[in-house]
Amino acid sequence: MDKSESTSAGRNHRRRPRRGSRSAPSSADANFRVLSQQLSRLNKTLAAGRPTINHPTFVGSERCRPGYTFTSITLKPPKIDRESYYGKRLLLPDSVTEYDKKLVSRIQIRVNPLPKFDSTVWVTVRKVPASSDLSVAAISAMFADGASPVLVYQYAASGVQANNKLLFDLSAMRADIGDMRKYAVLVYSKDDALETDELVLHVDIEHQRIPTSGVLPV
């Protein structure tokens, strides 16, 4: 067995093979990735000179409601076993929670996988009782009751799945910033073990503007 075969065998031993196999990258794929990176850098450069509340990745590029801005938090689930769960309450920065009576209109989850991701996950946001410890049994029951929409995110060979966002409208509930600690992001790894940091979840919380928001997000 040569060195490359030995390395491959060691890698397969450490991790159970996925349900499907990826096709070998083509030159067209490589060119597409390079072009995407160039466009991304160009967009960042242009955006830096145009402060605006029309955030390019928020609510599908919708404009924030008049008098509102948003706060983003990033969640990186730890390793999740096959057919198991992860839950994390929404904890905003102290500079935001200081204004706990400011209304929250919407919560959006954006799913961004790392390159090694090739699985299926279910993602949702739920209002969770303070007494809940977000155990596997508790999260499983919340996914099963059908009381909230669920984003099914699947591996896409061409890159990020087109539908990678889930939007929750809380305006009718008169929820405020102080209520956000009662909500949690829940993840179900359906088909495979999800490795540490294999998935990144960006949670955008649109809320009434607060005095500390002196600079518009871009």
UniProtKB/Swiss-Prot annotation:
Molecular-function annotations in GO: RNA binding; structural molecule activity
Pfam family, one: Cucumo_coat
Compositional bias segments (type: Basic residues): 11-21
Superkingdom, taxonomy of origin: Viruses
Entry's Gene Ontology cellular component terms: ribonucleoprotein complex; T=3 icosahedral viral capsid; viral nucleocapsid
Record region (Disordered): 1-29
Record-listed N-acetylmethionine modification sites: 1
Keywords assigned: Acetylation, Capsid protein, Ribonucleoprotein, RNA-binding, T=3 icosahedral capsid protein, Viral nucleoprotein, Virion
Main localization of the protein described in the UniProt heading: virion
Family note: Belongs to the cucumovirus capsid protein family.
Domain remarks in the Swiss-Prot or TrEMBL record: The N-terminal arginine-rich stretch does not seem to be the major RNA-binding region that allows formation of an infectious ribonucleoprotein complex.
Its biological purpose: Capsid protein. Probably binds RNA and plays a role in packaging.
Protein name: Capsid protein
Biological source species: Cucumber mosaic virus (strain C) (CMV)
Lineage: Viruses, Riboviria, Orthornavirae, Kitrinoviricota, Alsuviricetes
